């Protein structure tokens, strides 16, 4: 499903990632690693947001050769989302609905689900960190992607919102969608079944263990 080959990424003289191959099938995957280990860099590479050396393919679609088609299959929620502070939540919401040709009812249902509907007409600059995170998750789930990349999805949100996120991930996974998650916190095994855990160690992606089940 997802294949990365001959990946090399550095910032200036600082090498962050350097590995030959990493492949995963459909499923839910958790990526561990400390600050600066390369988790966010890896996610930005896969989502086509930064330049890199190597090849990335999703279901046979090559990021370099078919960038628009490739990106249309991926949703990415950053660890620390940064949006223009002067726009309203609804304006960002509408942008994602339009660009992803999504059903407005689906997007509105997501806003209700994460209890953000009353705040959608407020400017993003007035949002708390938790509200901002929930907005980014709503935007990530708008539309119908094949791969959802959620970088630190549990930070700044309360336990009730985390529970809702777990449920949504499981619902999407049951529809054949895949997830790449990263978290400094332990993913609760009684909340979410994870097919494989990986860790970035010395610029390499190393499998830790598999089948963290309910």
Regions found by a protein language model. Name each.
Residues 80, 85-101:
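Q-loop/switch helix immediately C-terminal to the Walker
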Residues 142-146:
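A short, proline-enriched helix->beta-strand linker immediately N-terminal to the Walker B motif
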Residues 51-70:
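Conserved ABC transporter NBD signature motif
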Residues 104-120, 141:
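Conserved ABC ATPase "signature" region
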Residues 137:
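Hydrophobic anchor residue at the start of the ABC signature
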Residues 46-47:
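Helix-to-loop junction immediately C-terminal to a conserved catalytic motif
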Residues 152-153:
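Walker B catalytic motif
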Residues 2, 16-19:
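Conserved structural motif at the start of ABC-family nucleotide-binding domains
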């Amino acid at each position: 499903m997802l294949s990365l080959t001959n990946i090399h990424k550095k910032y200036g003289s600082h090498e962050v990632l350097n590995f030959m191959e990493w492949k995963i099938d459909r499923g839910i995957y958790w990526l561990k690693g400390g600050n600066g280990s390369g988790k966010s860099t890896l996610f930005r590479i896969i989502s086509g947001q930064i330049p890199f050396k190597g090849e990335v393919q999703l279901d046979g679609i090559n990021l370099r050769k078919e960038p628009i088609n490739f990106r249309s299959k991926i949703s990415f929620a950053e660890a620390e989302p940064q949006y223009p502070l002067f726009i309203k939540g609804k304006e960002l919401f509408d942008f994602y609905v339009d660009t992803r040709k999504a059903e407005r009812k689906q997007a509105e249902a997501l806003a209700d689900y994460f209890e953000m509907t009353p705040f959608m007409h407020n400017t993003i600059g007035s949002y708390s960190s938790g509200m901002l995170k929930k907005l980014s998750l709503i935007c990530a789930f708008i539309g119908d992607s094949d791969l959802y990349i959620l970088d630190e999805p549990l930070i700044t949100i309360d336990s009730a919102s985390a529970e809702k996120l777990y449920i949504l991930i499981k619902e999407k996974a049951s529809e054949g969608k895949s997830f790449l998650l990263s978290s400094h916190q332990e993913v609760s095994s009684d909340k979410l079944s994870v097919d494989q855990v990986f860790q970035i160690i010395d610029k390499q992606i190393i499998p830790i263990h598999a089948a963290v089940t309910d």
